[in-house]
Structure formats: structure tokens, C-alpha cells
């Protein structure tokens, strides 16, 4: 009888461990998929930004889209509204030609939201750095689409 009880306890304990490890593996897979989706969205953001393509850039975001910069908070409710911004003209007047990520560090992750601390650099047409900024990007999955939903930047 004692052997049967011992086997039963061992079996229950083993099943519990199996269920816990399965849940942890699923959680890790969800987090890895979320990080991959968020990083792809950030790549899309930078490629469309450097291409000076306002519609593609707007499509790399989720809405409402929020940007904290230069002491202000700007909210765009739609891709159409965002695509009307004059960011490219303003940046080109300041000597900007293109940008790229220096670092991207995931600091929080769930299956549908990833917070990424970034450092990016802006360059002139001679590929000389003109500025470097830290930012925090919040990338979300909305209706199956990964896109940047909020940015807080030290850039003007």
C-alpha cells in the first residue's frame, strides 16, 4: 500500500513538473515570437523612414500613435493623418540624409507588447554622423500587425 501511495505521489509530482515546463516553454516561445515581430516592425520603420516614404512609414506604426519629444506629446489617430507630417523636409533642412539603429535592447516583453530601449544615429549625405539619440519604443501587436505604437525620444 505504501509503495502504491509513493508511486501515486511521484506520478502526480512528475505530471505537475511536466505541465509547468510545458507552460514555461510556451511562454518563452510567445516571447521570442513577440520580440521577432517587434524587431521586424522596427526594421520596417527604419527602412521606410530612410526611403522617405510617408505611407510605408505610417504603415509601420499602430494607432493611435504617440510620440513624446521636444517637450511635447503628439498623437496621430490614423495612418492617413501620420502620412501628412513634414518630418522629412524638416530633417533634410537640418542636414539629415539617413539614420540607423546603434542598439536595440528589449526591456519588457509580453505576447502582444514589447518595450525596446534604442540608440539611433542620424547621418548626412556624406555618411558622417550628425547626431545620436536615445529613445524608448513601445511596439504592439494589433489585429495581427506588429507596429510601433509609442515613442519617447531625446531627439527633437
Predicted features along the sequence, with ranges:
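Hydrophobic/aromatic beta-strand elements that line small-molecule binding cavities or substrate pockets
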Residues: 101-107, 120-122, 134-140
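A solvent-exposed, acidic/Ser-Thr-rich amphipathic alpha-helical stretch
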Residues: 54-105
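Bacterial N-terminal signal peptides that target proteins for export
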Residues: 1-12
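Bacterial N-terminal signal peptides
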Residues: 10-20
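A short hydrophobic beta-strand element
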Residues: 98, 112-120
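Short beta-strand edge/turn micro-motifs at domain boundaries
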Residues: 132-156
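Short, low-complexity N-terminal intrinsically disordered segments enriched in polar/charged residues
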Residues: 20-59, 63
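Short, cysteine-centered beta-strand-loop-beta hairpins and adjacent loop/turn segments enriched
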Residues: 94, 122-130
Amino acid at each position: 500500500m505504501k509503495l502504491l501511495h509513493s508511486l501515486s505521489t511521484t506520478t502526480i509530482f512528475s505530471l505537475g513538473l511536466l505541465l509547468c515546463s510545458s507552460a514555461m516553454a510556451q511562454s518563452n516561445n510567445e516571447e521570442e515570437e513577440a520580440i521577432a515581430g517587434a524587431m521586424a516592425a522596427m526594421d520596417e520603420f527604419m527602412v521606410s523612414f530612410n526611403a522617405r516614404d510617408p505611407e510605408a512609414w505610417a504603415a509601420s506604426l499602430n494607432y493611435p500613435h504617440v510620440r513624446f519629444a521636444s517637450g511635447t506629446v503628439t498623437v496621430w489617430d490614423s495612418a492617413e493623418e501620420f502620412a501628412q507630417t513634414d518630418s522629412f523636409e524638416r530633417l533634410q533642412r537640418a542636414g539629415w540624409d539617413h539614420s540607423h539603429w546603434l542598439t536595440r535592447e528589449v526591456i519588457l516583453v509580453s505576447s502582444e507588447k514589447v518595450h525596446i530601449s534604442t540608440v539611433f544615429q542620424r547621418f548626412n549625405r556624406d555618411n558622417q554622423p550628425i547626431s545620436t539619440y536615445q529613445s524608448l519604443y513601445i511596439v504592439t501587436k494589433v489585429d495581427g500587425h506588429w507596429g510601433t505604437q509609442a515613442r519617447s525620444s531625446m531627439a527633437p
